[in-house]
Amino acid sequence: MPKIKMIIGLGNIGKEYQDTRHNVGEWFIAKIAQDNNQSFSSNPKLNCNLAKVSIDYNNVVLVFPTTYMNNSGLAVSKVANFYKIAPAEILVVHDELDIDSGEIRLKKGGGHGGHNGLRSINQHLGTNDYLRLRIGIGHPGHKSKVANYVLSNPSIAQKKDIDSAIDNGICFLDDIINYKLEPVMQKLHTK
């Protein structure tokens, strides 16, 4: 059975995007690094900011692509090749429009669902056989509003809900790393 060796936090690079809904994946890995007293260092060769942590006695690389969302797959494939990490050993954490704020879901494989970061990762890895931790940001109501919505900051109440979802996901990280997926899915997916 595989173990997770790399966690990707999707988002856009730059201070202007740091607090936007589209960067909740970055928020997630930043919290992991902070909880483990680690900081990210820039790795231009691998197109990312990188930190290394130990989770439940497993060495895990935290990756924030510096390529912007639409080309995240470039960094993911470079880091995976450099560290010899298989797609099944990758966890991608990203924002999810189709899940309410404050909720979080774990998924194995599947399509990109219109998410450009996932689309890029699927293309660069040549597969969609990796784990995804989907952090709900809610939907603005109409597809014409999506781009502005994901690139804007959440309200104070919504930020609190998203932070709660991140904390909830981190509580289950040991089991996710060790591929104990069914119990995690049952707990995360039950209201």
Curated annotation (Swiss-Prot):
Keyword field: Cytoplasm, Hydrolase, RNA-binding, tRNA-binding
Keyword Cytoplasm listed: yes
Site annotation Stabilizes the basic form of H active site to accept a proton: residues: D95
Main location: cytoplasm
An example molecular function term from Gene Ontology annotations: tRNA binding
Positions annotated as active site in the UniProt record: H22
Binding-site residues, tRNA: Y17, Y68, N70, N116
Superkingdom of origin: Bacteria
Coiled coil location: none
tRNA-binding keyword on record: yes
Stored Pfam families: Pept_tRNA_hydro
EC number(s) recorded for this UniProt protein: 3.1.1.29
Record-marked site positions (Discriminates between blocked and unblocked aminoacyl-tRNA): N12
Record localization: Cytoplasm
Family matches, as NCBIfam families: pth
Assembly, per entry: Monomer.
Family in the record: Belongs to the PTH family.
Reported function: Hydrolyzes ribosome-free peptidyl-tRNAs (with 1 or more amino acids incorporated), which drop off the ribosome during protein synthesis, or as a result of ribosome stalling.
UniProt name for this protein: Peptidyl-tRNA hydrolase
Organism: Francisella tularensis subsp. tularensis (strain SCHU S4 / Schu 4)
Gene from which the chain derives: pth
